[in-house]
Amino acid sequence: MAKHTTSVPTQWIFLRGLVRESGHWGPFVPFFESQVPNARVHLLDLPGNGALYTLTSPTHLKAMVESCRQQLRNAGLDPPYAVLALSMGAMVAVLWAHDYPHELVRQVLVNTSMRPYSAFYERLRPRNWVTILALLARTLLRRATGQQWEAAVLRMTTSGHHPQVLQAWLLLRTAHPVSTANALRQLCAAAIFKAPARRPLVPTLLLASTCDGLVSVRCSRGLAHAWQVPLLEHPHAGHDLALDDPHWLVQQLCHGGVTSGR
């Protein structure tokens, strides 16, 4: 795969989704940096996840945006930034772009969903409800194991075969356990967030998996239609595009079109 060196932002922020952490990007980060030599990736965790797992997760995304900005200030990293954000992380990016458009030069939103452009049964496909409710019930009865949870998440979010990933995710779960209370608080924040009616002032690209088993591709299609921003679809990858097809994702990050509201 040819390296990409032109017209690509140099300072990237990567954000994951609900109860996921920066470690879940796995080998995609070094792969991206190897393909885009001038780019530097900064991984952020949302409060309650990853290195910040001991903090209380906010129930509003505004506080998550401010946490991201504070983490970057603490690290001495000044804007502007480009953002790659997955799922709930994309909601954080959208609010960031709305409140502080001068800080972002590009946002790439992957397999996300937002009110009022997505129905509740599109934001989480009904076939996953039984799995999640069963695991929650077993968790309350102290019968669900971490391996059962992570294996279920892997099945719901990927379309490929990734046996090595499960062990890596179990290690992350042990190192940075997300509390049930924080998971519910994050779910609340994602559920009540309402996307701005006006398309972002920041150049925006939507990426989605046509066969996403977790979130319906209709969510990204609805957002693309409402905002009149480009949407590129992967024909067979699952929700976790970075895991299922990192080559395709890098290609879109470097050459996919973006549209600005300016």
Q: Can you describe what each PLM-predicted range is?
A:
Residues 7-54:
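Conserved HGGG/HGGXW glycine-rich cap/lid loop of the alpha/beta-hydrolase fold
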Residues 42-84:
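Active-site loop/oxyanion-hole signature of alpha/beta-hydrolase fold enzymes
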Residues 85-89, 93:
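Gly/Ala-rich beta-loop-alpha elbow adjacent to hydrolase catalytic centers
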Residues 98, 105-139:
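Flexible "cap/lid" loop of the alpha/beta hydrolase fold
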Residues 200, 206-208, 212:
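Short beta-strand/loop motif that positions the catalytic acidic residue
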Residues 213-219:
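Conserved alpha/beta-hydrolase "acid-adjacent" motif
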Residues 237-250:
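Catalytic histidine-centered segment of alpha/beta-hydrolase-like enzymes
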